[in-house]
C-alpha cells in the first residue's frame, strides 16, 4: 500500500512540473515579438492573442493597439485598422514615452486615411 501511495505522489508531482512547463510556453505566445511574427500569416489568431495579452497586461496598450491595427489592415478592414492606429497614436501623444512609435503611428494613420479616401485627413497626418 505504501508503494502505491508513493507512486501516486510521484505521478502528481510529475504532472505539476509538466503543467508548469506548458504555462511557461503559453506565456511566450503573448509577447510582442511572437505576435509581430504571426500577424501577417494568421491575423485572426494574432487578434485572439492580443486580447489575452491585453488581459494579462504583458504588452503595453499602445503596442497592443498598433498590432491590432496591423492585423485588421492585413484582413482589409481599414476602418478598424484606422481606429486602433488612432488609439495607439493618442496613447503615444498622452504619455510621450516613445517618439519613434508615435512617428510610426502617424505614418500608419496617413496610410489608412489615404486607403479610405480621406485625403485631407491623410495630408494632415503627413504634415
Report each predicted region and the residues it spans.
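Sec-dependent N-terminal signal peptides
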Residues: 3-12
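A "functional boundary" signal
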Residues: 17-127
Amino acid at each position: 500500500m505504501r508503494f502505491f501511495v508513493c507512486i501516486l505522489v510521484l505521478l502528481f508531482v510529475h504532472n505539476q512540473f509538466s503543467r508548469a512547463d506548458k504555462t511557461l510556453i503559453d506565456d511566450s505566445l503573448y509577447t510582442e515579438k511572437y505576435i509581430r511574427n504571426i500577424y501577417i500569416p494568421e491575423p485572426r489568431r494574432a487578434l485572439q492573442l492580443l486580447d489575452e495579452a491585453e488581459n494579462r497586461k504583458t504588452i503595453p496598450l499602445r503596442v497592443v493597439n498598433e498590432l491590432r491595427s496591423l492585423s485588421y489592415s492585413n484582413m482589409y478592414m481599414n476602418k478598424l485598422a484606422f481606429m486602433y492606429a488612432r488609439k495607439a497614436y493618442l496613447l503615444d501623444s498622452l504619455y510621450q514615452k516613445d517618439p519613434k512609435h508615435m512617428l510610426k503611428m502617424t505614418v500608419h494613420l496617413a496610410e489608412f486615411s489615404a486607403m479610405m479616401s480621406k485625403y485631407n485627413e491623410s495630408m494632415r497626418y503627413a504634415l
